[in-house]
Amino acid sequence: MSATGKTVLRVENVTMQFGGVVAIDNLSMEVHEGEIVALIGPNGAGKTTAFNCITGVYEPTNGAVYFDDQLIAVNHPSGRMKRAYAGQNGTMYAGKHVHLTPDKITKRGIARTFQNIRLWSSMTVFENVLTAKHMRAKQNVFSSTFRGNAKEEKRMREETMTLLVEQGLDKYKDERATSLPYGLQRRLEIARALATNPKLLLLDEPAAGMNPQETQELARFIHEIRDKYGLTIFLIEHHMDLVMRISDYIYVIDFGSEIAQGVPKDVQNNQRVIDAYLGVVEDE
C-alpha cells in the first residue's frame, strides 16, 4: 500500500513542559494515509511524551494536534499563540484549548500499544480482545446480553474470533494472556488495538524484548496488518534494522526537538542523526 498524500495526523508546534523541564519543544510532524512512519531518537528524547500528547494522556503546554483534519488537542495560552486554529464547524480556538481524553480519541480512530505490555492479566486471550471491542462500543463485557442486546454481543464475539484467527492467536484463545510467550503477547496487544477498528495505529517500541527472529517476524506482521486493515502506522522504535526496513518516512528528535526527517536512506546518512543517535546505537 502506498501513501495517498492525505494527512491523517498533524502535530503542529507542540511543546510539552513539566515544571521547568521542556520534554517536547515546538515539534511538528505529519503522517499520511497508508504510511508507516517512525519516530526515533535517544532515550529521553521525548518520543513517548509525543505519543502521550497525541493520544490525550497529556495536554500539550502549547501547540495543536489534528486527526483527520479535526482538532483533538490545542493549547495556545493568551499572549503566546501565533495564530488561530480552526476546528470542526469552523470554530476558532485562538487563546483557548481543546483536550480530548484518551477514550474519546480511541473512538475517533486512534489506537495505541505501549513499550511495556499492558494486557489484562486476569483475562484469557479471547477476553482481552473482546473487552477491547466492548470498550470501543461503550458496552460492558458482562452486562450487554442482559440488556436485550444479545445479537450485538454475538456479533462482537464472532468478530473477536475472526480477529484471533487472522492473527494466528485462535489456538490460544482460552489461555491466560500473560501465559503466552513474549512475542505472542506483543501480537495479542496489537490484536487488542485492532479490535477498536482504528484508522491510525501507534506502536511504542513493538520490538522491545524480542529476539532477532521475532523482530523479523514483527516486520512482516506490521506490513501485513497495514495492508489487510487499511491502517496508517506511526511507531517508536530503537531497532534500526526494523525501522529502516519498514518505514516510509522517519522523524528524528533529540532533547524534544526535531533534528532530521526524511526517507530512511536520507536519515541514515544524516550526520546530525549519526552524531546524536545512530553512532551510539552502532557502538552498543
Task: Place the predicted regions along the sequence by residue.
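Glycine-rich phosphate-binding loops of nucleotide-dependent enzymes
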Residues: 2-284
